[in-house]
UniProtKB/Swiss-Prot annotation:
HAMAP family reported in the protein's UniProt record: Ribosomal_eL14
UniProtKB keywords: Ribonucleoprotein, Ribosomal protein
Gene designation per UniProt: rpl14e
Protein name: Large ribosomal subunit protein eL14
A cellular component term, taken from the record's GO annotations: cytosolic large ribosomal subunit
Top-level division of the source organism's lineage: Archaea
Amino acid sequence: MPAIEVGRVCVIIAGRRAGKKCVIVDLIDDKFVLVTGPKELNGVKRRRMNIKHLEPLDKKVEIEKGADDAKVLEAIRQAGLEEFMKEEVKPELPVPPSLGAYL
């Protein structure tokens, strides 16, 4: 099971969309992929993203390479992942050692 593949559901871990879930739509090269939320579902626009900024999940939707947002949204609904995709992931921030004594 390859981690980075078309249809794989991922969590964005860097940038202003951090914590939101997205679906890989296309593989651009060995460092970049095309992802979408889609925007109507959770606000993530279709865009190019570095794979280092994604955390792949164990879920996958059946879409073809380069599928448009309507087809991705339909595949998410068929897989029963609509509510799952809307939920945001809150990252656990590490506590710096200097603040550990105050907690």
